[in-house]
C-alpha cells in the first residue's frame, strides 16, 4: 500500500444493503462527505428479507420514498401464527397499519435511487481488507475487484456489511451466539391453490414453514424439515420444499415454477458493543437472528435512522461523545429484544410433542385474544411501540415515537423532518437554533408546551415553552452533544446552532 493515494471523506460506510444505503443517503442529505463501499459488483439476486414493517415505512416516508416502495409489493394486515392465532396489524396507530411484502432487492433499488438523486454513488467491487483507527480518524484499506489497492481516510466508519462483516472482523470483535436452525430452505414459487392473503406460519415439531405473497403471482416460502438436514451448499430441490411445507402447513398449495431456490442456516448473534472508538456497526454486522417475524432488515434500517443524524452532528463539530454513545444505549437493547422475540417464534414452532403443540396453539390463541396483549404484540413486531430510554426526571414523552401529524402550514410532520431536521412542535416561539424548524400541529397540542422531535421521529425534549430557549442554547450552542439537564432527553442537533 506504500505510495497509494488516500481518498478522504467524513464517513465511510461499508455495505450497500438497505442499512448502508439508508445511512449513506441520510448523511449526504445532511451535507456529510460519504464514501459507500460494496463488495458485490452489481445487484444481488439473493433476497431473504421480504417484510417491511410499519415503523420502517414511517422512516421511509420521512425520506420521501415510502409510496415508491409500497408500489412494488402487497400488504397484509395480520400475522398468522400456529394455525388460528394471529397478530392484528390493522389497528396500529400508523399511516401504515400493515406489513408490506416485497423482495429486499426492491428496497435496495428504491434506496439506491434515492442515494443517486442526492448525488451519492456506490463504489462496487470493493473488499475491505483492513481497518485501523487513531485519535483523529480511521483508515480503511480496500482491494478492488481488479486487484487494485485503495485506501480511504475518514473521521468515522460504519460497518453495515452483513453477518460476515469485514469491518467487525478487522476490529477483532466477537460475535457471540449460536446456530438455531440449520438447512433452512428458501423458495420463490407460484401456487396453484394459494392460501388467504396473510403471512402464514406454522410448525409441527419435525417441520416448520411460512408462506407470504409478493402480490404479483409469486410467493416466498421458508421451509425446514428436521428429518432432512444437509449442508448449506447442497442444491435445493422443489420436492424438498413441497414436503416440508406439507408437513408444516398441511398442503404445499400446488407450488411450481420456482424462480429461486436456496439453503441457509439461521443464527442468533449480537456483538457486545455497536461502537468501538470511531467505528460503528449496524444491521446484520451487529446482530442476526431467525427470519421469523421478518424483523431483520427492519432492525437494520432503524439502526441507520438512529445513527445517521448523530454522526452528522459529530461531523458538524458539536455532536459529542455522549451523543455517539447513545447509539449503543438505544439500539443494543432493541437488537437483544429482537433476538429474543424471533427466537421465541421459532422455538414455539419447533415444539415436537403433539400435546405440546396443542398447548402452544391454545395458549397463544388465548393470549392474542386479549386486546392489550394483542396491541402490545403488534407494537413490538412492527416497532411502532418502541420507546427509547429517557434520563431520570425527563418528561414522560421523551424517547417516545411521534406519529405523523398534519401541520397548519399544509405539510405533515414527516415532510418537516425530511433532510435530517429537528422539528419543534407547539405554539409559535422565538428564535431557534439552526438545526430546528418550528411547526404547529393542525389539531391538538397544549398552550405553552413544546415538543422537540428528533430527525428519526422520536421525542428528544418536551416541556414548558419558557424552558426551551435556555436548554437549546446550552445544548445546541456548546457543541458537546451532552444533555444539560434532566428534562433534556436523548437528543442532539445536526448542524452547529447559533443559540
Task: Please place each PLM-identified region on the residue numbering.
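Core Rossmann-like FAD-binding/catalytic domain of the broad FAD-dependent monooxygenase superfamily
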Residues: 1-358, 364, 368, 488-499
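A signal for specific C-terminal beta-sheet/loop modules enriched in small/flexible residues
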Residues: 86, 233-244, 439, 464-481
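Short, well-ordered loop/turn elements at secondary-structure boundaries
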Residues: 205, 275-277, 284, 418-420, ...
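C-terminal helical "tail/cap" subdomain of flavin- and related membrane-associated enzymes
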Residues: 313-403, 408-422, 427-435, 447-456, ...
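Thiol-based oxidoreductase modules, predominantly thioredoxin-like and allied folds used
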Residues: 437-443
Amino acid at each position: 500500500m506504500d505510495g497509494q493515494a488516500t481518498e478522504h471523506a467524513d464517513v465511510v460506510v461499508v455495505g450497500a444493503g438497505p442499512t448502508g444505503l439508508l445511512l449513506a443517503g441520510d448523511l449526504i442529505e445532511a451535507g456529510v462527505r460519504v464514501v459507500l463501499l460494496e463488495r458485490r459488483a452489481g445487484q444481488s439476486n439473493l433476497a431473504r428479507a421480504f417484510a417491511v414493517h410499519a415503523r420502517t415505512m414511517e422512516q421511509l416516508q420521512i425520506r420521501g420514498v415510502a409510496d415508491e416502495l409500497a408500489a412494488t409489493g402487497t400488504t397484509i394486515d395480520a400475522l398468522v401464527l400456529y394455525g388460528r392465532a394471529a397478530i392484528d396489524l390493522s389497528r396500529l396507530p400508523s399511516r401504515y397499519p400493515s406489513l408490506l411484502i416485497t423482495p429486499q432487492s426492491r428496497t435496495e433499488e428504491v434506496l439506491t435511487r434515492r442515494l443517486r438523486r442526492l448525488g451519492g454513488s456506490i463504489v462496487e467491487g470493493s473488499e475491505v481488507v483492513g481497518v485501523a483507527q487513531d485519535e483523529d480518524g480511521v483508515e480503511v484499506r480496500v482491494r478492488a475487484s481488479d486487484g487494485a489497492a485503495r485506501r480511504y481516510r475518514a473521521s468515522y466508519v460504519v460497518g453495515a456489511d452483513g453477518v460476515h462483516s469485514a469491518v467487525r472482523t478487522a476490529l477483532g470483535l466477537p460475535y457471540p451466539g449460536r446456530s438455531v436452525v440449520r438447512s433452512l430452505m428458501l423458495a420463490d414459487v407460484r401456487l396453484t391453490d394459494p392460501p388467504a392473503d396473510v403471512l402464514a406460519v406454522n410448525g409441527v415439531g419435525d417441520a416448520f414453514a411460512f408462506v407470504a405473497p409478493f402480490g404479483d403471482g409469486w410467493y416466498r416460502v421458508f421451509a425446514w424439515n428436521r428429518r432432512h438436514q444437509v449442508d448449506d451448499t447442497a442444491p435445493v430441490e422443489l420436492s424438498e420444499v413441497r414436503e416440508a411445507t406439507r408437513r408444516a402447513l398441511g398442503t404445499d398449495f400446488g407450488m411450481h415454477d420456482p424462480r429461486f431456490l436456496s439453503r441457509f442456516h439461521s443464527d442468533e448473534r449480537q456483538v457486545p458493543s455497536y461502537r468501538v472508538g470511531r467505528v460503528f456497526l449496524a444491521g446484520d454486522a451487529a446482530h442476526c437472528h431467525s427470519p421469523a417475524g421478518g424483523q431483520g432488515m427492519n432492525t437494520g434500517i432503524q439502526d441507520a435512522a438512529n445513527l445517521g443524524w448523530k454522526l452528522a452532528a459529530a461531523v458538524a463539530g458539536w455532536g459529542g461523545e455522549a451523543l455517539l454513545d447513545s447509539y449503543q444505549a438505544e439500539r443494543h437493547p432493541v437488537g437483544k429484544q429482537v433476538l429474543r422475540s424471533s427466537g421465541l417464534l421459532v422455538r414455539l414452532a419447533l415444539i415436537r410433542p403433539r400435546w405440546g403443540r396443542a398447548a402452544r396453539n391454545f395458549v397463544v390463541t388465548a393470549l392474542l385474544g386479549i386486546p392489550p396483549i394483542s396491541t402490545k404484540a403488534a407494537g413490538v413486531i412492527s416497532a411502532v411501540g418502541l420507546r427509547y430510554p429517557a434520563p431520570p426526571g425527563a418528561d414522560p414523552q421523551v424517547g417516545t415515537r411521534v406519529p405523523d401529524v398534519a401541520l397548519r402550514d399544509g405539510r405533515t410532520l414527516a415532510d418537516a423532518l425530511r433532510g435530517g431536521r429537528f422539528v419543534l412542535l407547539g405554539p409559535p416561539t422565538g428564535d431557534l437554533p439552526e438545526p430546528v424548524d418550528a411547526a404547529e400541529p393542525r389539531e391538538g397540542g397544549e398552550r405553552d408546551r413544546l415538543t422537540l422531535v428528533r430527525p428519526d421521529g422520536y421525542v428528544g425534549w418536551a416541556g414548558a415553552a419558557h424552558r426551551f430557549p435556555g436548554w437549546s442554547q446550552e445544548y445546541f450552542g456548546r457543541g458537546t452533544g451532552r444533555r444539560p439537564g434532566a428534562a433534556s432527553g436523548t437528543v442532539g442537533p445536526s448542524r452547529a446552532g447559533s443559540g
